């Protein structure tokens, strides 16, 4: 369902009544969750957003977003968990196991065929047709997909594990997963087996060559029934998958030696020190605590890891920053009521100077390579000039006509060549050009045509450029240049008042610079922890505007200038950023 990009219709903060209804719906849909787990999944006070979108096939989907990650989605009044939720509650749904090579096809939009299932020693989970199920990979219980069973367990066994097993709705690495923090599945060890089962499983790992051949082509049967379904890669034996199982099991022991809370505390401090050492400069101070977290700490989180303060011992960012202040690394002040800012940093503190920037993991880089979106590169914007009807006679000798687009250097060359070809350079003063009838008609005002006989070169060229119509050329990476008349509109940032005297930040003209308003809205929603909406821009045909709750000009400016590297001259409204100490 989310194998291709979707279109966001709206993104708003959830109301109290809707939050209570969602809790009730979660309790009904997933009765195995306890009251505390439901409260953890649907928090009482933390921000929770409702995103309404259209999937690429037109299905209307409602997505619930908490902490920047989609946690649930609703389709045709049915509630489904995302992989982010299943990683926290891996036993929420009956789970079926497949081989790692199959994942690529599931991400591409294929359903899971029964030949791709791995039969566990205890047998397949008992499900009925239409039941919601999770799909995991051999060696790791963390689900990588969810789907609906196409038949009951009894029918699966009766069919000899042939045919369509599950209609897949959502997977790790699809576009719904990409709308979150893009973390990788955690390593969750398989459930413990008794000695008899362990012996049986160990024996099953030693596959003979015949069985390996059957496994290599197991998905081809499914492909006959469903053209989108997977085919195992010919250059990699599936016998490697069970070997990975034992390796993952060994690696899990070292990870389990520390509690999840201790691991999150270490990650929090690592991102904190990394951000101070590499991203924050003295000129950035004072720096809003929320900006420090959203624009600096999150970007320092290693690939495959998810920074979640709520899972640390600190629980809140303010408490963590107070601890760092006690260690005299930073100084924090409340410059406006309820809003904390970092006002000073001791960059000579031993913890900062001794901090070693971690190198990116080759494994995580490989895992994320296929799913990482191409980075944004600013367009090449070139000013041009368009030949109007009144200037046609001057430019037609050089092969140009009305409506031709020229660069400034081309205009200069054409005018100089015209003057020299027609012997218009003054013999007594080479810096002057005599004006013939064509030049008079093209560049002089009516009241000047009988008084001005000569012009200096610079004045002639300046007047010529002024008489031409402005135009511009935009070239986006990998695309053909786009040429338009007029001057390119800058990205326009404004502040507006809405109901209850609330401020919102509105940004327009993103499309002219190759930016997708929906993508920008999603990024700002996570960075600012504020609701965002995308609406048609008033008075502009086929143009959209992004609206963010509160004064978010600082976050927006950082995104456009620092991350997207857009020139400041193409952005207007940056001066409206909230000043330190000023109340929102």
Curated annotation (Swiss-Prot):
The modification N-acetylmethionine is found at residue 1. Keywords: Acetylation, Cytoplasm, Initiation factor, Phosphoprotein, Protein biosynthesis. The keyword Protein biosynthesis applies. Residues 227-238 have a biased composition (Basic and acidic residues). CDD domains: eIF2D_C, eIF2D_N, PUA_eIF2d-like. Transmembrane segments: none annotated. Residues 223-257 are annotated as: Disordered. SUPFAM superfamilies: eIF1-like, PUA domain-like, SWIB/MDM2 domain. The keyword Transcription does not apply. GO terms for cellular component: cytoplasm. Residues 247-257 have a biased composition (Polar residues). GO terms for molecular function: RNA binding; translation initiation factor activity. Residues 93-173 form the PUA domain. Belongs to the eIF2D family. This is Eukaryotic translation initiation factor 2D.
């Amino acid at each position: 369902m989310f194998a291709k990009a979707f279109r966001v219709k709206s993104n708003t903060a959830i109301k109290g009544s809707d939050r209570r209804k969602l809790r009730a719906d979660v309790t009904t849909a997933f009765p195995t969750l306890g009251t505390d787990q439901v409260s953890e999944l649907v928090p009482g006070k933390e921000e929770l957003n409702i995103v309404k979108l259209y999937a690429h096939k037109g299905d209307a989907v409602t997505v619930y977003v908490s902490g920047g990650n989609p946690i649930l989605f609703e389709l045709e009044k049915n509630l489904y968990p995302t992989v982010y939720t299943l990683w926290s509650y891996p036993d929420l749904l009956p789970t079926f196991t497949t081989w790692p090579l199959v994942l690529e096809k599931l991400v591409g939009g294929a359903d899971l065929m029964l030949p791709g299932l791995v039969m566990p020693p205890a047998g397949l989970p008992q499900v009925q047709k239409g039941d919601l199920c999770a799909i995991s990979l051999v060696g790791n219980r963390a689900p990588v997909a969810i789907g609906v069973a196409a038949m009951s367990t009894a029918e699966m066994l009766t069919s000899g594990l042939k045919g369509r097993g599950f209609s897949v709705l959502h997977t790790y690495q699809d576009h719904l997963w990409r709308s979150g923090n893009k973390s990788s599945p955690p390593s969750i060890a398989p459930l413990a087996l008794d000695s008899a089962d362990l012996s049986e499983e160990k024996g099953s790992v030693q596959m003979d060559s015949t069985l390996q051949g059957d496994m290599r082509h197991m998905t081809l049967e499914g492909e006959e029934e469903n053209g989108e379904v997977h085919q195992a890669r010919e250059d990699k034996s599936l016998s490697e998958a069970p070997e990975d199982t034992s390796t993952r099991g060994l690696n899990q022991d070292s990870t389990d030696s520390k509690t999840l809370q201790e691991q999150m505390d270490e990650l929090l401090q690592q991102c904190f020190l990394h951000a101070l050492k590499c991203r924050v400069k003295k000129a950035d101070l004072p720096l809003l605590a929320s900006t420090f977290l959203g624009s600096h700490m999150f970007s320092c989180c290693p690939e495959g890891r998810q920074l979640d303060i709520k899972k640390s011992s600190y629980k809140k960012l303010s408490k963590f920053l107070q601890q760092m202040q006690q260690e005299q690394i930073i100084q924090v002040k409340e410059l406006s009521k309820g809003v904390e800012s970092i006002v000073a940093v001791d960059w000579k503190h031993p913890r900062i100077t001794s901090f070693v920037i971690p190198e990116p993991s080759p494994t995580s880089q490989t895992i994320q390579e296929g799913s990482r979106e191409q980075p944004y590169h600013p367009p090449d914007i070139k000013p041009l000039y368009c030949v109007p009807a009144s200037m046609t006679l001057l430019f037609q000798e050089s092969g140009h006509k009305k409506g031709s687009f020229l660069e400034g250097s081309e205009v200069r060359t054409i005018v100089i060549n015209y003057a020299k070809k027609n012997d218009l350079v003054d013999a007594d003063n080479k810096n002057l050009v005599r004006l013939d009838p064509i030049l008079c008609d093209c560049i002089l005002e009516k009241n000047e045509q009988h008084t001005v006989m000569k012009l200096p070169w610079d004045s002639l060229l300046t007047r010529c450029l002024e008489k031409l119509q402005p135009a511009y050329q935009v070239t986006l990476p990998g695309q053909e240049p786009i040429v338009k008349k007029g001057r390119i509109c800058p990205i326009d940032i404004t502040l507006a008042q809405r109901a209850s005297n609330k401020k919102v930040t509105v940004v327009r003209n993103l499309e002219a610079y190759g930016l997708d308003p929906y993508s920008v809205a999603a990024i700002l929603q996570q960075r600012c922890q504020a609701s965002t909406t995308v609406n048609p821009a008033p008075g502009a045909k086929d143009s959209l505007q992004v609206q963010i709750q509160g004064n978010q000009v600082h976050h927006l400016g950082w995104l456009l200038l620092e991350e997207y590297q857009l020139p400041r001259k193409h952005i207007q409204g940056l001066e409206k950023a909230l000043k330190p100490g000023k109340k929102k």
